[in-house]
Amino acid sequence: MATGQIFSKTTQALFYNYKQLPIQRMLDFDFLCGRETPSVAGIINPGSDGFQKLFFGQEEIAIPVHPTIEAACNAHPTADVFINFASFRSAAASSMSALKQPTLRVVAIIAEGVPESDAKQLISYARANNKVIIGPATVGGVQAGAFKIGDTAGTIDNIIQCKLYRPGSVGFVSKSGGMSNELYNTIARVTDGIYEGIAIGGDVFPGSTLSDHILRFNNIPQVKMMVVLGELGGSDEYSLVEALKQGKVQKPVVAWVSGTCARLFKSEGAKSGGELESAQSKNQALRDAGAVVPTSFEALESVIKETFEKLVEEGNIPPVPEVTPPLIPEDLNTAIKSGKVRAPTHIISTISDDRGEEPCYAGVPMSTIIERGYGVGDVISLLWFKRSLPRYCTQFIEICVMLCADHGPCVSGAHNSIVTARAGKDLVSSLVSGLLTIGPRFGGAIDDAARYFKDAYDRGLTPYEFVEGMKKKGIRVPGIGHRIKSRDNRDKRVQLLQKYAHAHFPSVKYMEYAVQVETYTLSKANNLVMNVDGAIGSLFLDLLSGSGMFSKQEIDEIIEIGYLNGLFVLARSIGLIGHTFDQKRLKQPLYRHPWEDVLYTK
């Protein structure tokens, strides 16, 4: 491995398995360091493509999303770092795929628990092809002022405190990702800061070793000293001992192998397998090889400070110019939660709330709806009228839904849905095709019937005055008239609704007025009977006014908005869906209207 610097201020990465927070932290670090281009060139999310919106400073940017590693590499040939956030189950396969890409030279594997056999194969391939693996089980790495991997170094506040926004003179490598944050802070306090920091990961077989990175740091002119933090267990530290003994490292190395707190990290590499793998043996071996090893972890900070100050006195470390990092704009959601800003909302909702443990309809929890045995009518009363209506009202709503659910295949709505379904269209297209026929001539006259009946009754018009007045205006009376029903063949649905209302409603004044209008219109023509639109419209007026739960203004608003037509739309959707399923189940062919049923004329 050896060689030298693996990251720079122009390094770009491909990020595998989209994770919003680590990517945003990388972009925030970029902005903090004054990078001109984002360090994340593309995202790989298997099976997906498109873009993900993230922030680069104050500017919102769109980062391309690719379905495969190959597609991402082809689209971003200058991106040479692969950051793998796959789970341990798929980390090995995706990492091997990345290693085989000619444009990628560094692969960081974040997942813990990668099988040892898979790790060995990855390491073997990487070494044979001059690639660098960081991990598995790593938090990543950082080159101060240039590039960082994922969640390395934590929050922006911690990065600023550790002065990672500009390069220092110390190369740092550790097994533990958790302890690396602590050491970044320590090093920033007593030196001019980190130049590069790497956490190799705590698994038994790391993709790159402590000595790999120390030898690499030794070749980087800007790195003047190195700090190593090892753990008991394994033999990785002994390769560093050999490198020191052989004189391969010419720069000061401060080292400590942690033994007392390794159990807290529970990493695979921290399992001691004998005396040679103990922290005491490793520390002594490093000390004997020429590393500066403190007597305890608590003394590590002072030893780092002494080593750095000695280099400064010898003139080996020029002063690092301090820079003031730019302020990272705070996310709106974070600022709102902290009470720092207020922002207007874009949608107002008063009928439901899904922010708690369970959705609430008009303030009624879902569990209450189920426990109390509420029906569809009760749910409609909550979501449409924002109140719990009496049972006779909600039962009337349910009756309307049942009676209007379907009226055979010959009416315009069902016909359209059938034709659309037979054309091979999907359920939603077939449903909408039928719904779009609902209007003044088919099912959409309920609101108008209620509107005109209410106006006439409230103004005290006689049926004669009402009907003749509508005639003079050239307006047909909504809710009156039927294509197949007549005086002698009444609509059974109308009769059922009227029967229910007589038995349960406290008042049926609007329905009685509509019946009087029907009596007058029947004197003109045998088919001018009350239809289901007229029955529902007049009876809904009686429901709204008789329940005592609505003001006159609310009733007028309900009719004006179109609530009552909504009832027909809801009900008839059941039948239209049924006709669609029926045609598909019967595997009916494309419909073509027969010639003999068309009058061809000039």
Give short role names for the model-derived ranges.
Residues M1-T334:
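Catalytic-core regions of core metabolic enzymes
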Residues P326-K602:
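Non-transmembrane, aqueous-exposed alpha-helical and coiled segments at domain scale
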